[in-house]
Amino acid sequence: MKPNKETYRILVIDDHPIVAEGIIALASQLEGVTCKGATCAKDVEQLTLKERFDLCIIDLELPDMNGFQLISHLHSQIPECGILIYTMHEEPWIIAKLSTLNINGAVSNMGHRTKRFFQWSGKMGERF
């Protein structure tokens, strides 16, 4: 997940605009970070054909493709890109499946119950 240039590019993928805008607002405050948002897999496909990203933050529930399919698509389209899942799902089978998908981490967005499913990799380039 090494930045390709001086700017670290993040793509936030969530079908709830207020969630995406919040994540973008927070991440954009970091020095050297630029963010874009997408609300569906179709938008992701168009964006990733035009430009590269260093990290994708993905909601598992999208209107036109499930997150597992999107992860697979991103691995083939931009294999060097890190992937962080941000989801309301805490079901054991989902966590187990995520742990097999070569992603960088997963975080629950369940309000006061927010917790990490598994540790976000702090070292550039590391994956699970």
Task: Mark where each language-model region is.
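Acidic catalytic/metal-coordinating carboxylates
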Residues: 39-40, 66-69
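As written
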Residues: 67, 98-105
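The feature encodes the CheY-like receiver
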Residues: 63
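Short amphipathic alpha-helix used as the core "switch/output" element in two-component signaling
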Residues: 68-79, 96
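Short hydrophobic/Thr-rich beta-strand motif most characteristic of the beta2 strand and flanking loop
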Residues: 32-40, 47
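Conserved acidic segment of CheY-like receiver
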Residues: 6-18, 23-27, 37
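The C-terminal output helix
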Residues: 121-128
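Active-site residues of response regulator receiver
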Residues: 59, 87
